[in-house]
Amino acid sequence: AIVLMAIVIFIYRDWIFDYVVTGPINPDFISYRFLCQFSHWAHLGETLCMPPVEVNMQSNTFGGQFLGSISMALIGGIIVAFPFIFWQFWLFVKPALKENESKNTRYVIFWVSFFFFLGAAFGYFLLGPFTFNFLAGFQLGSRGTIRTLPTLSDYIDNLTNIILGCGLAFELPVLAHILTRVGIISPSFLRSTRKYAVVVILIVAAFITPSPDWMSQLIVFTPLFLLYELSILVSDRVHKKTEKESEEWS
């Protein structure tokens, strides 16, 4: 499945590169337009309108663009084929589970895939544009003597880290389900560490947003905080179900 998806991406590499891969650094990207329109609609002026930045990538080796195309195809193949990859992994792990444990993981492939793609979309449409806009526009010194000229591989690596990182980070509710099920964490533990989680999320949101205004940071903070709250709800539900099963066996 990975190879098949990679071949398809490689065949249509020019279109995918122009309209998908370089989307987050395109001034006309849908996220930029939506945030700016929302800013005007909410009577915030230009608060959420990120200034366009010019990003000129370079390839400093003869085979750089070709290798970049292969890298883009393979990474894209892995992302698109993630449900199949996890399904294969699950087929390997499932026989080691007990019958009641296996029954409680009936929809695990769907939920793992759902949260992965949700996180990947968050990284691509929100975190990616914020990050690249900030890093490309950041200037050291006041004379403008330093120009940011990222390589193709540098951009692809950063975009990959953002998408895969967010995809895996959004697996937090699934991870909370598993860790609660095996007794490593509990809903009370997650609730007691909520204040620390809020501080960490606020720091992350402040670091990756291009401007210091509260609205930009709130847009990044909100989905991450909701993800943590969802993990608490999932953990609480699993914990109650586990206690009920223990009472039935006793």
Language-model segments: which ranges?
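Membrane topogenic/interface segments and analogous intrinsically disordered interaction regions
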Residues: 1-250
